[in-house]
Amino acid sequence: MKKLLTLLFAVTCVYGCSQTQNPTDESKTARIPMVMVDGELYLDTGYDSTIEGRCGVMDGEITSTVDGTERPIKDNQSNFGKDIGYQYGTTEGTIEIYQNEKWRIFATEDVREQIQSEHKNDIIQTE
């Protein structure tokens, strides 16, 4: 009986150790802030807008939200909050979202990569 219990305990330990959670499990990790506008997904670029003298009229408003681990699937839906205004950016493929008294630049995936690449090149040239 003692051997059987020892064997059962060992099997349980081995099985339990093999059931570790994957920290990169996409369904449970926070995603980059993003919003769906006009059927297009816009992602946070990490940059604030430098445009001054705005008209003050919003082009739209984020009206619904999903969990921070999800991707928005409806227009005017984000994964970071709602009741937030936005304006279309001066660069095609961008919108600017007013948050925390700053205008944050969001862009489609392709445009976001361009912006980040250009910014990276600017940093390299100034060093």
Model-based region annotation:
Residues 1-4:
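Positively charged n-region of N-terminal signal peptides that target proteins for export
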Residues 7:
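Short basic-aromatic helix/loop recognition motifs at nucleic-acid
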Residues 13-16:
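C-terminal motif of bacterial Sec signal peptides marking the signal peptidase cleavage site
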Residues 18-20:
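Bacterial signal peptide processing site
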Residues 26-94:
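Mature extracytoplasmic domains of secretory-pathway proteins
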Residues 98-127:
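C-terminal partner/receptor-binding element of secreted or periplasmic proteins
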